């Protein structure tokens, strides 16, 4: 399976998991050029959540949680800013950056994975 297919499968798995947690999925793979994309954007009551999904099939050398770099965090913050510019109805919502780490078949949802840089 190619990297993109694996990533899409992990993101779909994350979306299904978030639905079981009563979150509303607003966007999937939101493109925010030139910064990249946000894997999942969800709404939990009055909190807008920008979610990065990381998957590791083998955890011998690193866990998925360790793959969220400082550079990626900066890109997510910038991408979130673009999302808010395009969706002003969410301007007054609280925002949060979460990580869903999938290691083999285990899902770890890390709320507030990092603060705004």
Curated annotation (Swiss-Prot):
A Pfam family the protein falls into: UPF0102
An MF annotation (GO) of this entry: nucleic acid binding
SUPFAM superfamilies: Restriction endonuclease-like
InterPro entries noted in UniProt: Restrct_endonuc-II-like, tRNA_endonuc-like_dom_sf, UPF0102_YraN-like
Protein family according to the UniProt entry: Belongs to the UPF0102 family.
NCBIfam families: PRK12497.1-3, PRK14682.1, YraN family protein
Entries under PANTHER family matching the protein: UPF0102 PROTEIN YRAN (PTHR34039:SF1)
Name the UniProt record assigns to this protein: UPF0102 protein FTT_0898c
């Amino acid at each position: 399976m190619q990297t993109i297919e694996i990533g899409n499968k992990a993101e779909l798995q994350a979306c299904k998991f978030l639905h079981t947690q009563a979150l509303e999925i607003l966007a999937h793979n939101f493109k925010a050029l030139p910064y990249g994309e946000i894997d999942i954007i969800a709404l939990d009551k009055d909190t807008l959540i920008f979610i990065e999904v990381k998957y590791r099939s083998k955890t011998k050398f690193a866990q998925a949680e360790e793959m969220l770099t400082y550079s990626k965090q900066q890109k997510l913050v910038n991408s979130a800013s673009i999302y808010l510019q395009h969706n002003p109805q969410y301007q007054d919502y609280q925002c949060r950056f979460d990580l869903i780490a999938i290691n083999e078949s285990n899902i770890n949802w890390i709320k507030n994975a990092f603060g705004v840089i």
